[in-house]
Design a protein with these regions (language model features):
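Cytosolic-side transmembrane-helix boundaries in multi-pass membrane proteins
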Residues: 135-136, 145-148, 266, 270, ...
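Inter-helical junctions in multi-pass inner-membrane proteins, predominant
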Residues: 144-162, 315-320, 349-387, 412-423
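Transmembrane helix-bundle core of multi-pass membrane transporters
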Residues: 240, 245-318, 348, 411, ...
Length: 451
C-alpha cells in the first residue's frame, strides 16, 4: 500500500533533533532589554550609557552587559553587569529579574525587588533603555533603495513559507480528487493550538530551551493536523468525492465552521501566546542610519518551511506514494488497474495535507507568538489564493504561489497604501483566473474547469 510517511518521518526526525538539542544560539533579546533598562538605575543620574558587548552570562539564565558610562565630568568609565533571571527559553517567567551582579558588587535582594517592582516595567524605565549599542559598525554600505528592498525581502521570508505550506495542502487534495477543502486554515489553527500545548508540556517537564519546546510542538502539530484532516476529510471529502463538487465544497465549509467553534470552546476565545524567542536582530547591511537586519526566529521559520517543502517535493517525485499520487491524479481507473487503492491513497493524502497545515500553524506560533481560533480563516483564504495563483493541481506550483503571494503582500505594504493591499491581491487573482486559469505551473487551458 502506498502511504505518505516519508515527509512525516523527515519532519519528525527534524523535530526530534531539535528536541534533543538544548542550547540557544543567541542571547535572549527580552532578557537583554530588561538588563539594559536596569543600568541607568545603577549609575549616576544624567550619565550616558553605551553598550559595548552583550553576551550570555555565567551559569545560564543570565545576561552579561559590558558598557561604558560617559558622565558630565571626568573620563568615561567601563563597567559590567550580569542580570540573572528566574527561567529561560520558552518559560513564562523568563522575564522575571531575580539578581544583579556588577563589578562594584551584587545588589541586595531588596534592591532587586524594588528595581523589578517599581522601575523595570515603568514608563520611566522603558524610556531610559540605552539601546543595544552601535552594532552596524563595519557593515557594507549600500544605496538606500537597495537596503529598503532587501529589508522587505527578509521580512517576507516567514510569510512566504507559511503560505507555501498551506497552499501545498490545498494542491495535494485538489490535484488528486479535484475537490477543494476549505478547512485547511482552521487545520492550521488546530496545529497552532497543538504546538502551544507541546511547548507547555515541554516546559512542564523541565525542557525550557526553545529548541526542545519547539521540537515537541512540531511533533504535536504534525500529529494533530494529520489526525484531524484524515478523520474529518473522510466524512467531508472522501465519502462524497464521487459526487459533484458542490456537496464536498459545502461540507468543507461546515467543517471549517465546526473546527473554528471547536477551538473556541476547547481553548477559550483568548489567544494563548508563547514568549518571544530569538528576536534579537542581526544586522546585515546599512544605508546611512538605516540598518538592514533579520531576526534568528525568521531564519528558523523560513528554514523549517523550506526543509518541509523540499521533503514534500522529494516525496512527490521519488517515492512510491508520489508515483501512486501522480498516477491516480492522471487516470484513476488506470491507476486502480495497476493496484493503487484510491481510498487508502486519499486517506494518506488527507493526512499529509493536514500535517503540512499543522506545520504551517506551528510556524505562525513560532514567528508571531500565537494564532487565535478565528485566525485560520484569513490565513487559509490567502493560501487558497496562492494555490490558485501557482496552479492548484500542482504541488510545486502551489509552493511558488505561496512565495509570490507572501512577497506581493510585503512589497505592497512597503511601497503602496496598505489599506489597498487585499483589494490589489484579489484583483490579481481575478486577472490570473481570466488570463491563465491554470495558474503559473498548472494547465494553460483557458476553458471552463470544475471547481
Amino acid at each position: 500500500m502506498p502511504g505518505a510517511p516519508a515527509p512525516l518521518k523527515a519532519a519528525a526526525a527534524a523535530a526530534l533533533t531539535l528536541f534533543a538539542s538544548g542550547c540557544q544560539f543567541s542571547v535572549d533579546a527580552e532578557q537583554a532589554r530588561i538588563c539594559r533598562i536596569a543600568l541607568p538605575a545603577l549609575n549616576a543620574p544624567g550619565s550616558q550609557i553605551i553598550i559595548e558587548r552583550t553576551q550570555p552570562g555565567p551559569g545560564g539564565r543570565s545576561v552579561r552587559l559590558d558598557y561604558r558610562v560617559e558622565g558630565l565630568v571626568g573620563p568615561p568609565l567601563r563597567h559590567w553587569a550580569v542580570c540573572r533571571f528566574a527561567a529561560e527559553g520558552l518559560s513564562a517567567s523568563k522575564a522575571e529579574l531575580v539578581g544583579v551582579d556588577t563589578d562594584r558588587g551584587p545588589l541586595s535582594g531588596s534592591s532587586v525587588y524594588l528595581l523589578r517592582r517599581f522601575y523595570v516595567d515603568s514608563v520611566e524605565g522603558l524610556m531610559a533603555d540605552p539601546g543595544p549599542g552601535d552594532r552596524a559598525a563595519g557593515l557594507r554600505e549600500v544605496p538606500e533603495p537597495v537596503a529598503y528592498l532587501a529589508q522587505q525581502v527578509l521580512v517576507s521570508l516567514p510569510r512566504t513559507g507559511i503560505y507555501g505550506l498551506l497552499a501545498a495542502a490545498y494542491a495535494l487534495v485538489f490535484g488528486l480528487v479535484s475537490r477543494i477543502n476549505l478547512a485547511f486554515g482552521e487545520l492550521a489553527a488546530v496545529g497552532a493550538a497543538a504546538a502551544v500545548a507541546g511547548v507547555a508540556m515541554a516546559t512542564g517537564l523541565g525542557f525550557s530551551a526553545p529548541l526542545a519546546g519547539l521540537g515537541l510542538g512540531i511533533l504535536c502539530a504534525l500529529f494533530a493536523g494529520a489526525l484531524y484532516s484524515a478523520v474529518a476529510g473522510h466524512f467531508a471529502v472522501a465519502r462524497i468525492a464521487s459526487r459533484s463538487a458542490q456537496p464536498s465544497l459545502i461540507a468543507t465549509v461546515g467543517l471549517s465552521l465546526f473546527l473554528m467553534e471547536y477551538l473556541r470552546l476547547a481553548q477559550s476565545p483568548v489567544t494563548v501566546w508563547i514568549p518571544p524567542i530569538w528576536s534579537d536582530t542581526l544586522p546585515l547591511l546599512r544605508a546611512g542610519s538605516f540598518v538592514v537586519g533579520v531576526t534568528p526566529v525568521s531564519l528558523v521559520t523560513s528554514g523549517v518551511a523550506a526543509a518541509a517543502a523540499a521533503a514534500l517535493l522529494t516525496t512527490m517525485h521519488r517515492s512510491g506514494f508520489g508515483r501512486a499520487w501522480r498516477a491516480y491524479a492522471d487516470d484513476p481507473k488506470a491507476a486502480a488497474l495497476s493496484g493503487v487503492d484510491g481510498r487508502r491513497l486519499l486517506a494518506g493524502t488527507l493526512a499529509l495535507a493536514g500535517a503540512m497545515a499543522g506545520l504551517a500553524g506551528t510556524l505562525v506560533v513560532t514567528q508571531y507568538g500565537g494564532l487565535g481560533f478565528a485566525g485560520g480563516f484569513q490565513l487559509g483564504l490567502k493560501a487558497l489564493i496562492a494555490a490558485v495563483f501557482g496552479g492548484i493541481g500542482s504541488v510545486a506550483g502551489a509552493l511558488v504561489g505561496g512565495i509570490a503571494i507572501g512577497a506581493f503582500e510585503t512589497l505592497w505594504s512597503a511601497y503602496f497604501p496598505i489599506e489597498m493591499r487585499d483589494v490589489a491581491l484579489y484583483a490579481s487573482l481575478i486577472a490570473v483566473l481570466v488570463f491563465r486559469p491554470g495558474g503559473l505551473l498548472g494547465s494553460r487551458d483557458p476553458g471552463p474547469r470544475e471547481v
